[in-house]
Amino acid sequence: MPDQLNSRVETCYQQAETFFKRTFKRPMVSFQLRGQKAGVAHLHENLLRFNPQLYKENAEDFLRQTVPHEVAHLIAHQLFGGSIQPHGEEWQLIMRGVYELPPNRCHTYAVKRRSVIRYIYRCPCPDSDFPFTAQRHSMVRKGRRYLCRRCREPLVFSGETRTE
């Protein structure tokens, strides 16, 4: 997986060097990115971070659009300095002129939400399900008490969990 992506990063740098007739310092490439972001360019560290899950699910578009998008940030920073806007005209120039791609700010990849476990707590009131997060459930196990707002009785773990 990283070989194709690293190769694409190198190709993007070679394109920029041909276009601008100068060399650029190569970045470190990391696959330590999770969540909704497909990629992040850390300008001062000369580091590119990519989301391996989104890459796996959208490899073709990722290589075509996301990699040049992030490389363009580093190229723009090396050419124009740190006072430019992240998706400003300098970055757009690189996207259009060097990579011949639309300067899209955001990806449209489907991002799966992480499933979350809820711990069901109850009190004597009818229909009294209280779904607790893992953090709140942990607090109860450490001795914290939560009371029902209606009956003022302590909420007790039912032994049930629910995945959302």
Swiss-Prot record:
Belongs to the SprT family. This is Protein SprT. It comes from Pseudomonas savastanoi pv. phaseolicola (strain 1448A / Race 6). Signal peptide: none annotated. GO terms for cellular component: cytoplasm. PANTHER family: PROTEIN SPRT. NCBIfam families: PRK04860.1. Its cofactor is Zn(2+). Zn(2+) binds at residues 69, 73. It comes from the Bacteria. GO terms for biological process: response to stress. Residues 14-156 form the SprT-like domain. Pfam families: SprT-like. The active site is at residue 70. It is found in: Cytoplasm. Binds 1 zinc ion. HAMAP family: SprT. Its main location: cytoplasm. GO terms for molecular function: zinc ion binding. Keywords: Cytoplasm, Metal-binding, Zinc.
